[in-house]
Amino acid sequence: MKAVWQGWWRRGRVVARSLQGPVRSPAGLGEPRFRTFDEPLAWVIVALLTIGLVMVYSASIAYADADRATHSRFYYLIRHALSLGVALGAGWCVFRVPTRIWQRWAPKIFLLAIVLLALVLVPGIGKVVNGSRRWISLGFMNLQPSELMKLAVVVYAADFTSRKAVYLQGFFLESLWKGFVPMAGAIVLVGGLLLAEPDFGAFAVVAVIAMATLFLGGINGRIFFGLLIIGAVAAVGLVVSSPYRMERVVGFLDPWQDPYGKGYQLSHSLIAFGRGEWFGVGLGQSVEKLFYLPEAHTDFLMAVIGEEFGFAGIATVVGLFAWLVWRAFHIGRESRKLERHFQALAAQAIGIWIGWQCFINIGVNLGLLPTKGLTLPLLSYGGSAILANCMALAILLRIDWENRLLMRGYKV
């Protein structure tokens, strides 16, 4: 173990030197200079985190100012900034770890995430908020294991798919029993733990990450098509079997039928977008965040962005996310060219995670999807979510960093 940590430390020093500026290729004989990390991707991540910090303060100031327990209108801003600092520090540590280590430890990471999900359900350990048992209190912060499970599924699904590629791409029965069934069993276990909290939104994200990774790994087409049908039927069954979820669907179909009951959140979200028009009412000038729109600084942050910055602000945020997802898939394609199959799948799975969760959150805010308890990645208030997002993007940056060095003759 000591030797492993020493190896990571030495590699970390190389990373630190490379981040200070351009370096020369191995030959060093008149070849062009190059940078060893993806600067545009890093700046897009910084831009999204900065937008999130500003908008969390804007959306939460009324809540913090009215709550005597917080003693400050900067309460949520300070907590979000501290969470962001911890997340960036964790991201830096993750960036220094070679991706082969993540692949080697993927099953253990996945198992640890399952244990944390199980601990949430234990009375006295799991913390109940708004009727859901999703958090573990650590004293200085509340840890939400479902957010860490998303990262665990990314590395585990990428590792599993890269190891089982021969079976996944083989005959139907071989692909089914040796490729699909083990992964399906793991996701069903995770789904049972998440639905027990309950956290249907996190389960939807985890299931899509796993399914999409199997698809990218070349799973038999008939199995994947059957999986889509089974997934759709299961989703409908979960909604119909829960009166709470049915109420959300009914409120989603016509929020104006009961604007003070089932459709309250969605109706006020739509009002916020309507007030924003093209360029918004200005930073800090939102009316809906003044106790009209619940969860304005978490699940419905995009509605506040729409009200204060209008269509232009929404288009900017969506454009940044779209570029980030495209870049993740591009890094995955570059990894595949280098025959780094785990890294390729992990990069694209991170892109799927960010893109799919953004799609659900923005769709809910716009009334295109039923209300879910999912935050907007990198922007919404929430320490565990920011931590998991920054760690995932650090892995993405590390994959790209290793690709660049390999293409120029370095070993990683």
From Swiss-Prot:
GO terms for molecular function: lipid-linked peptidoglycan transporter activity; peptidoglycan glycosyltransferase activity. One of its GO terms (cellular component) is plasma membrane. It is an enzyme of class 2 (transferase). Pfam families: FTSW_RODA_SPOVE. InterPro entries: Cell_cycle_FtsW-rel_CS, FtsW, FtsW/RodA. Pathway: Cell wall biogenesis; peptidoglycan biosynthesis. It is found in: Cell inner membrane. It catalyses: [GlcNAc-(1->4)-Mur2Ac(oyl-L-Ala-gamma-D-Glu-L-Lys-D-Ala-D-Ala)](n)-di-trans,octa-cis-undecaprenyl diphosphate + beta-D-GlcNAc-(1->4)-Mur2Ac(oyl-L-Ala-gamma-D-Glu-L-Lys-D-Ala-D-Ala)-di-trans,octa-cis-undecaprenyl diphosphate = [GlcNAc-(1->4)-Mur2Ac(oyl-L-Ala-gamma-D-Glu-L-Lys-D-Ala-D-Ala)](n+1)-di-trans,octa-cis-undecaprenyl diphosphate + di-trans,octa-cis-undecaprenyl diphosphate + H(+). Residues 1-40, 95-108, 156-175, 221-222, 325-348, 397-412 are cytoplasmic. Its main location: membrane. Belongs to the SEDS family. FtsW subfamily. This is Probable peptidoglycan glycosyltransferase FtsW. It comes from Laribacter hongkongensis (strain HLHK9). The lineage of its organism: Bacteria, Pseudomonadati, Pseudomonadota, Betaproteobacteria, Neisseriales. The gene is ftsW.
